[in-house]
């Protein structure tokens, strides 16, 4: 049975920095473990019966944290085990859209990439391998949050369906990136280095630590953490996606760039879903707090792609990349219902039809002509070809 985590008051970024994100992920605080009575001195059987009576009658308890009870997404929902009748049609539509976009790593042809890979300059190979290392680790971190926090907190069935499917897709993304590394990198020591990027690469570790800190933060509200992980999938991924699309513009690495199309479409939908969940919240973080989270993510991503792993290695302009990350952040702010922060234009014309909004041409055009037939039409037929 899933349990409801009770968000407490928010904490400052300075306090967050003092928490070791890896040590903060504890399994010891699961609420579905019954409270221990070992510390209660049971002096008589009458007292013992009274204690057990109190445990058996939770309805008599008065909630000390009304914020959870005030949130339709988070409060106890006895109907969470069944899907119908649909109550949140917009959330359900998002789930069906994700379901219709299902794909697997085996469908991506990497046979032509090896020849391209060997023809790349050393700087280009260095950049691509390190970006893939970040991606391979980051999807696992997103799943850690979905499993440990969001899926346990949210009590709305439609949202749980989406989170469950998102977990499956993040696994496929992680498999795809691992397969790309395994295909391109022949040296076993270099592969091991890339697969352990969170420990071996400081620039990747910095981004991972920021995300892990939000997972382990027991005091941040659900709303703050939704914004933080919208930033992870909408901002932390955006520049790296753009850099791979830059390779596509140059006609390079068809397998890598096709998988990038599929994954960026998925992440755009995940980011849109986070914004939808945010809109359903009754108690939202203030615009100032949201700006603080978003600008922090922007600074980390700009540093990653212009200093730690500069896009100039593949011939891109670092200044324009900084601007693109700010453009993506502004778009996310608008989607969350707030004002733009940076007020800049999209500097990359090749990214005009490739955004992380989810309202892109990806889904409508059926990227790579791939979409599960009939899923979005709500129709059932027995005359399909098998």
From Swiss-Prot:
Signal peptide location: none
Q: Which GO terms describe its cellular component?
A: cytosol; nucleus
- What does the sequence similarity comment in the record state about its family? Belongs to the ribonucleoside diphosphate reductase small chain family.
Q: Which domain of life is it from?
A: Eukaryota
Q: Does the keyword Transport apply?
A: no
* Additional remark text: Two distinct regulatory sites have been defined: the specificity site, which controls substrate specificity, and the activity site which regulates overall catalytic activity. A substrate-binding catalytic site, located on M1, is formed only in the presence of the second subunit M2.
Organism the protein comes from: Mesocricetus auratus (Golden hamster)
State if Oxidoreductase is listed as a keyword. Answer: yes
**Subunit comment for this entry?**
Heterodimer of a large and a small subunit. Interacts (via Cy motif and when phosphorylated at Thr-33) with CCNF; the interaction occurs exclusively in G2 and early M.
Q: Which PROSITE patterns match?
A: RIBORED_SMALL
Any Pfam family from its record, for instance, is Ribonuc_red_sm
**Predominant location of this chain?**
cytoplasm
State the protein's name: Ribonucleoside-diphosphate reductase subunit M2
Record: residues binding Fe cation 2? 170, 233, 267, 270
Q: What is its EC number?
A: 1.17.4.1
Cofactor binding notes: Binds 2 iron ions per subunit.
Question: Which Gene Ontology terms cover its molecular function?
Answer: metal ion binding; ribonucleoside-diphosphate reductase activity, thioredoxin disulfide as acceptor
Q: Which residues bind Fe cation 1?
A: 139, 170, 173
Q: Which CDD domains match?
A: RNRR2 (cd01049)
Q: How is it modified after translation?
A: Phosphorylation on Ser-20 relieves the inhibitory effect on Wnt signaling. Phosphorylated on Thr-33 by CDK1 and CDK2; predominantly in G2 and M phase.
């Amino acid at each position: 049975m899933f349990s409801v985590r009770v968000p407490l008051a928010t904490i400052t970024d300075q306090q967050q920095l003092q928490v070791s994100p890896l040590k903060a992920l504890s399994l010891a605080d699961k609420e579905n473990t019954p409270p221990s009575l070992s510390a209660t001195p049971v002096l008589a059987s009458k007292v013992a019966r009274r204690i057990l009576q109190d445990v058996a009658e939770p309805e008599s308890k008065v909630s000390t944290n009304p914020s959870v009870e005030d949130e339709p997404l988070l409060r106890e929902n006895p109907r969470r085990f069944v899907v119908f009748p649909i109550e949140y049609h917009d959330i359900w539509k998002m789930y069906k859209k994700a379901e219709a976009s299902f794909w697997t790593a085996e469908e991506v042809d990497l046979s032509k990439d090896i020849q391209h890979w060997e023809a790349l300059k050393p700087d280009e190979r260095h950049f691509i391998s390190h970006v893939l290392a970040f991606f391979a680790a980051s999807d696992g971190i997103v799943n850690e949050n979905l499993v440990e926090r969001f899926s346990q907190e949210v009590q709305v069935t439609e949202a749980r369906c989406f989170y469950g499917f998102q977990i499956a897709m993040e696994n496929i993304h992680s498999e795809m990136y691992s397969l790309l590394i395994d295909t391109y990198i022949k040296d076993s020591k270099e592969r091991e280095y890339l697969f352990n990027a969170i420990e071996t690469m400081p620039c990747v570790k910095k981004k991972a630590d920021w995300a892990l800190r939000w997972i382990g933060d027991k005091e941040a509200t659900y709303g703050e953490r939704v914004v933080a992980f919208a930033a992870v999938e909408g901002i932390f991924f955006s520049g790296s996606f753009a850099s791979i699309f830059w390779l596509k513009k140059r006609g390079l690495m068809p397998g890598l760039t096709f998988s990038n199309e599929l994954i960026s479409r998925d992440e755009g939908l995940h980011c849109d879903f986070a914004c939808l969940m945010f809109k359903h919240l009754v108690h939202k973080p203030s615009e100032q707090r949201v700006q603080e989270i978003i600008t922090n993510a922007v600074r980390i991503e700009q540093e990653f792609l212009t200093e730690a792993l500069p896009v100039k290695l593949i011939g891109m302009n670092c200044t324009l990349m900084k601007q693109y990350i700010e453009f993506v952040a502004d778009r996310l702010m608008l989607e969350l219902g707030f004002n733009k922060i940076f007020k800049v234009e999209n500097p990359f014309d090749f990214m005009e039809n490739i955004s992380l909004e989810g309202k892109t041409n990806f889904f409508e055009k059926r990227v790579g002509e791939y979409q599960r037939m009939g899923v979005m039409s709500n129709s059932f037929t027995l005359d399909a070809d098998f």
